[in-house]
From Swiss-Prot:
Keywords: Glycoprotein, Hydrolase, Protease, Secreted, Serine protease, Signal, Virulence, Zymogen. Residues 36-122 form the Inhibitor I9 domain. Residues 1-16 form the signal peptide. It comes from Trichophyton equinum. The active site is at D169 (charge relay system), H201 (charge relay system), S357 (charge relay system). This is Subtilisin-like protease 2. GO terms for molecular function: serine-type endopeptidase activity. GO terms for cellular component: extracellular region. SUPFAM superfamilies: Subtilisin-like. The gene is SUB2. GO terms for biological process: proteolysis. Residues 17-122 form a propeptide. Transmembrane segments: none annotated.
Length: 421
């Protein structure tokens, strides 16, 4: 049985000190949602076979509740809850007794049965301004002496126009002045909760992608896809939200003009890695955080999904913060310590945070930016272009990771550009 502790990846900061080290993301029995499961079906099943399978599940579950599991209660009595269809991947969540789980694991249509997992948010603390990260995007990784150093940010004025960034997170304050009306509410998977951001993380991430002051792609649209609320979630909600995003991108004909950001990480969980991989095969790019364990990211989800763009965090002087995960699965390094962006609590609120949650949206913003300035026909082309622009061999203590930092390619362009101060 695989266990997961899954978190959004921002870390607290104390003025005058380096960012404190995060608590390791540890998995344990308390992470499992008792009686609740994610069932992955084998590929190639027809709609009729899936329909018949669900009828079989309902019949077996009902019989088990009346017989073997007569004492079952709570979520175990729910049966099938939600179905997820991502490209050709079919999964469903449900509440089942142990006997039904045993029956499911032996069913010829079932690939795997995993316990659903709790998903936890990381602690955050408000801190003063830091704007070095944007300047880093256009400076070819030029280090600065202090995180408070202001650096010019040069960029093509298309700046993500016409592109959609989907933020699977805690929601977004779409009325924040930084978004200038370019943020919209998409999907809210959390029952009986408003589609607002009470935690701040999603608004912060969206601001790095597309805020008018703090954003990489200052004209991109951002879509709030809420799978977290105030501290925890489960794959039941995360998969529902990711499924909605993939469907919305596909139905809106936005595959070459959309990017998904996942500033989340936890122990390896194959069903969600599979979902990210299927989205890639469907023609959709996903950018993910490497994680804040200070360990090899190959053991984290969704960082370990083979065709996600996995992002580690770098400091202003080109060192790897000790919290950032590393390893061969990390594709690129981006600013991730003392980064200022939008926040909860008001339409002008800001916060300065650290973590690979901040690094990932820098690259998601770059993807949106490049989609608006270049004709990138597929997620493979997106990844190739992002990596082709990187500057090599700058990160100190990158361990065995590919050593390449993010760059937007602006210095090679031959026309007058606006500047951000």
């Amino acid at each position: 049985m695989q266990l997961l502790n899954f978190g959004l990846l921002l870390l607290p900061f104390v003025a005058g000190d380096l960012a404190p080290q995060p608590e390791p993301l540890l998995a344990g029995p308390s992470d499992v949602v008792p009686g609740q499961y994610i069932v992955t079906l084998k590929e190639g099943l027809t709609s009729a076979q899936i329909r018949d399978h669900k009828k079989w599940v309902s019949s077996v579950h009902r019989a088990n509740l009346e017989g073997f599991a007569a004492g079952a209660s709570g979520v175990e009595t729910e049966g099938i809850m939600k179905h997820f269809h991502i490209h050709d991947l079919n999964m469903y969540s449900g509440g089942f007794d142990e006997k039904t789980v045993e029956d499911l694991s032996r069913n010829p249509y079932v690939k795997s049965v995993h316990p659903d997992q709790h998903v936890y948010l990381a602690k955050t603390v408000t801190q003063r301004q830091a704007r070095w990260g944007l300047g880093y995007m256009s400076s070819k990784g030029k280090p600065v002496p202090l995180h408070s150093t202001l650096v010019d940010y040069s960029y093509d004025d298309k700046a993500g126009e016409g592109v959609w960034a989907y933020v699977l997170d805690t929601g977004i304050n779409v009325n924040h002045v930084e978004f200038e009306g370019r943020a919209i509410l998409g999907h809210n998977a959390i029952p009986n909760k408003p589609h607002t951001d009470e935690f701040g993380h999603g608004t912060y991430v969206a601001g790095i992608i597309a805020g008018k002051t703090y954003g990489v792609a200052k004209k991109a649209n951002v879509v709030s896809a809420k799978a977290f609320d105030t501290g925890s979630s489960t794959y039941n909600y995360i998969l529902e939200t990711y499924d909605w995003i993939v469907r919305n991108i596909t139905d809106s004909n936005r595959k070459n003009k959309a990017v998904i950001n996942l500033s989340i990480s936890g122990a390896k969980y194959q069903p969600f890695d599979d979902a990210v991989e299927k989205a890639f095969k469907a023609g959709i790019a996903t950018v993910v955080a490497a994680g804040n364990d200070g360990k090899d990211a190959k053991n984290n989800t969704p960082a370990s999904s083979p065709n996600a763009i996995t992002v580690g965090a770098v400091r202003w002087e080109n060192t790897r913060p000790s919290f950032s995960n590393y390893g061969k699965i990390v594709d690129i390094w981006a600013p991730g310590e003392l980064i200022k962006s939008c926040w909860k609590g008001g339409n002008n609120a800001t916060s300065t945070q650290s973590g690979t949650s901040a690094a990932s949206p820098h690259v998601a913003g770059l993807v949106a930016y490049l989609m608006s300035t270049e004709n990138l026909p597929s997620p493979s082309a997106v990844t190739a272009r992002v990596l082709n622009l990187t500057i090599p061999n700058l990160v100190k203590d990158a361990k065995d990771s590919p050593n390449r930092v993010v760059y937007n390619g602006i210095q090679e362009r031959k026309f007058t550009l606006p500047k951000y101060f």
